Swiss-Prot record:
Gene3D superfamilies: 2.60.120.200. Its cofactor is Ca(2+). Binds 2 calcium ions per subunit. Belongs to the pentraxin family. Induction: Strongly down-regulated in colon by dietary heme, or by dietary depletion of vitamin E. Up-regulated by calcium. This is Mucosal pentraxin.
Length: 219
């Protein structure tokens, strides 16, 4: 009985295949190139954003372009998009406008990405593996829509769909957090815990296609 209660607390399956789970210590694995494998992340609250902070960890050995995090609304593609165009070249979109951050990377190392953006100044700040890659400006005064589809594993070319296998993510993603405010990234890079919109320790999500959940290999 005790084990059953604990299991119920850790994983609750909701209608339509949606799950709630403490994903601490686990990773989503996207084992192969696909246009059908992805995970929908469901925020605790749907709200418009004038500031946000996004942190996540990932591993891949892809050398082609791929999407890591895709946030679309019905009226705007690439409201928030984290996309790798080339090795070490990170394209960060807000409101379908991009800033590019470049860093030397080892092809076979996991990455810890933290980025924030504030509407008032338009400044986006990007950190990779605990080191700042600088600050750039985009979409000053913009408001990110709140009625969104949030997807990891694919890049949305329409609201919740129109995926291209050649932009799909192959590898592992874990410790995803999203906040509705700016967090100093020199603090956030130590941990990806506690997002008030998306929190990996209390995650609501839906797996689609060939996605596997396993204990994470890296911290």
């Amino acid at each position: 009985m005790e084990k059953l209660i604990v299991g119920t607390l850790l994983l609750t399956v909701l209608s339509g295949g949606i799950s709630q789970s403490d994903m601490d210590g686990k990773a989503f694995i996207f084992p192969q190139e696909s246009s059908t494998a992805y995970v929908s992340l469901i925020p605790r609250v749907k709200k418009s954003l004038q500031n946000f902070t996004l942190c996540l960890k990932a591993f891949t050995d892809l050398t082609r372009p791929y999407s890591i995090f895709s946030y679309n609304t019905k009226t705007q593609d690439n409201e928030i998009l984290l996309f790798v165009q080339n090795s070490g070249e990170y394209m960060f979109y807000v409101g379908n406008s991009a800033a590019i951050f470049k860093a030397p990377t080892s092809l076979y190392d996991p990455v810890h990405i933290c980025v924030n953006w504030e509407s008032a100044s338009g400044i986006a700040e990007f950190w990779l593996n605990g080191k700042p890659l600088g600050r750039k400006g985009l979409k000053k005064g913009y408001t990110v829509g709140g009625e969104a589809k949030i997807i990891i594993g694919q890049e949305q070319d329409s609201f919740g769909g129109n995926f291209d296998a050649k932009q799909s993510f192959v590898g592992e993603i874990w410790d995803v957090s999203l906040w509705d405010h700016v967090i100093p990234l020199e603090e956030a890079h130590d941990s990806c815990d506690g997002g008030n919109l998306i929190n990996f320790r209390a995650l609501t999500y839906e797996e689609n296609g060939y996605v596997v959940t396993k204990p994470k290999l890296w911290t």
